[in-house]
Amino acid sequence: MKQFEIVTEPIQTEQYREFTINEYQGAVVVFTGHVREWTKGVKTEYLEYEAYIPMAEKKLAQIGDEINEKWPGTITSIVHRIGPLQISDIAVLIAVSSPHRKDAYRANEYAIERIKEIVPIWKKEIWEDGSKWQGHQKGNYEEAKREE
């Protein structure tokens, strides 16, 4: 288990939260993003995530560094699951600790936005009558390969 990682097994929240705890931290905010059944009136059967793992983990760690620069004293742990995920499964977990709660909340929100912007993870939504790749799956893979 690593502080910033891509996994294929179900995410266990406590072990990632523990990465962020020490005697200086007064707040820990843990966000979990789950697979929802309905999106814009369409019923999702399940999701399939893919990632360019080496670059994805590098980018997750970069987000942790960015957070520590913006909110000194914070500690971050981020994990994203890939493969097939069923309804209610945890797809992403972000744990951020800070001496004070406001920074932990702000940093956690920053992390999920940055994941969507820079991490080469691709999501396919599967419905009863079809499927579609969602998000930034065009371009990020080639960009990720160039950055490696």
UniProtKB/Swiss-Prot annotation:
Transmembrane segments: none annotated. It catalyses: 2 [molybdopterin-synthase sulfur-carrier protein]-C-terminal-Gly-aminoethanethioate + cyclic pyranopterin phosphate + H2O = molybdopterin + 2 [molybdopterin-synthase sulfur-carrier protein]-C-terminal Gly-Gly + 2 H(+). Pathway: Cofactor biosynthesis; molybdopterin biosynthesis. GO terms for biological process: Mo-molybdopterin cofactor biosynthetic process. InterPro entries: MoaE_sf, Mopterin_biosynth_MoaE. SUPFAM superfamilies: Molybdopterin synthase subunit MoaE. Belongs to the MoaE family. PANTHER family: MOLYBDOPTERIN SYNTHASE RELATED. This is Molybdopterin synthase catalytic subunit. It comes from Staphylococcus aureus (strain COL). The lineage of its organism: Bacteria, Bacillati, Bacillota, Bacilli, Bacillales.
